[in-house]
Amino acid sequence: MPKTDRVIEEITDYVLEKEITSAEAYTTAGHVLLDTLGCGILALRYPECTKLLGPIVPGTTVPNGSKVPGTSYVLDPVRAAFNIGCMIRWLDYNDTWLAAEWGHPSDNLGGILAAADYVSRVRLSEGKEPLTVRDVLEMMIKAHEIQGVLALENSLNRVGLDHVLFVKVATTAVAAKLLGGGREEIKNALSNAWIDNAALRTYRHSPNTGSRKSWAAGDATSRGVHLALMSLKGEMGYPTALSAPGWGFQDVLFNKKEIKLARPLDAYVMENVLFKVSYPAEFHAQTAAESAVILHPQVKNRIDEIDRVVIRTHESAIRIIDKKGPLHNPADRDHCLQYITAIGLLFGDITAQHYEAETANDPRIDKLRDKMEVTENKTYTEDYLKPDKRSISNAVQVHFKDGTSTEMVECEFPLGHRFRREEAVPKLLEKFSDNLKTHFPDKQHKHIYERCTSYETLQTMRVNEFVDMFCM
């Protein structure tokens, strides 16, 4: 057999052997866990999300199955991973990673939590000790790192592929480890994840933007669990899945460029991950949203007097969310820089409801969008790519018909950035509490919040007991 591709070897070594020593990474992972589950709980208010949940065949029962938070479903770990992953991503309100490729590393929690809960319940049935939340946090750190470091220099979007491939790869690696896989099983599963290929980005762009972007990560993380389970049954792998001449991923799909890990795998991504604290909007627009909300008091009574709105931004924002013309659904609207900015200017806040038809039918929104000029600021683009800065800058200025204007409101770092972490954490916990309140009775909400916000209690909790707290 040929020598295994280096990237597959490095990821396998990392998952099996790397000890995570960063206290900051574990603390941040705890916040990611709560924030991500809170986003999933909030999504249960939306029928378009909940219609996709549950067993694929009604009435299916699974002994020692994985439970789906916020529901009464007990599913096999593959289907549970889809359910949890779908909930997490539905409102585009969980964490974000921005680099040559974009993504949301907490999407991997769908597969991680489903696998960990399943393993814990099986162990208990055998009289063994279950996994703890600390084990989940470690796998979250590692999944974040795998997905995020792959994203640093490997741009899937440049070749029309969706970022959820990196979710599938990351989940595959850590799920195989959680389920009891060793070196060969993890390598075999990883090779199959690459050979699977990736979803196209068709559903993220006009004229086809649609709800698949809200369940694509659930699909990817569940596939990761599926491949991990297959490898544990002895399914073979393919050592040069990436590099095989003519037939490997690199030659067929990546313009014959090498897939590489831009830095050693440790805890960099979890330490630097971006939270969506304030607004459920595509992350490249977060600072535009903050700027627009700041300007709201100055413009709210002068909307009809606006001549133009100037937005200065970075190249990635222009490529992903600079949209003109009709927007067809919530998935289209929450990925439109101009729509998000207009909502901030008009209402002084941005919530998930603002993407629904009731708000979108307000004629003032499209009138404002038509008056917007989006231009690239080269410095913003450069700072976006600097590893020690990673800013996501936007600036907004409103010009009126009488020749006056507001100041140019610039925001470099959104509230969820590492540079603003101390400021963000109290608001992040408030967001978690608010999301719980949308679904759980007061007593259950209080019980979950108190146990989860004590870090020592959280990390030592058994996984099955942690999940049980969130179930109906």
Curated annotation (Swiss-Prot):
GO MF terms, alphabetically ordered: 2 iron, 2 sulfur cluster binding; 2-methylcitrate dehydratase activity
Biological processes per GO annotation: propionate metabolic process, methylcitrate cycle; sporulation resulting in formation of a cellular spore; tricarboxylic acid cycle
Listed EC numbers: 4.2.1.-
Catalysed reaction equations from the record: 2-methylcitrate = 2-methyl-cis-aconitate + H2O; citrate = cis-aconitate + H2O
Keywords: Lyase, Sporulation, Tricarboxylic acid cycle
Reported induction: Subject to catabolite repression.
Classification via Pfam families: MmgE_PrpD_C (PF19305), MmgE_PrpD_N (PF03972)
Enzyme's top EC category: lyase
InterPro entries: 2Me_IsoCit_deHydtase_PrpD, MmgE/PrpD_sf, MmgE/PrpD_sf_1, MmgE/PrpD_sf_2, MmgE_PrpD, MmgE_PrpD_C, MmgE_PrpD_N
Summary of the function given for this chain in its UniProt record: Involved in both the tricarboxylic acid (TCA) and methylcitric acid cycles. Has both 2-methylcitrate dehydratase and citrate dehydratase activities. Catalyzes the dehydration of 2-methylcitrate (2-MC) to yield 2-methyl-cis-aconitate, and the dehydration of citrate to yield cis-aconitate. Cannot form isocitrate. Uses either (2S,3R)- or (2R,3S)-2-methylcitrate.
Family: Belongs to the PrpD family.
Protein name: Citrate/2-methylcitrate dehydratase
Native organism: Bacillus subtilis (strain 168)
Lineage: Bacteria, Bacillati, Bacillota, Bacilli, Bacillales
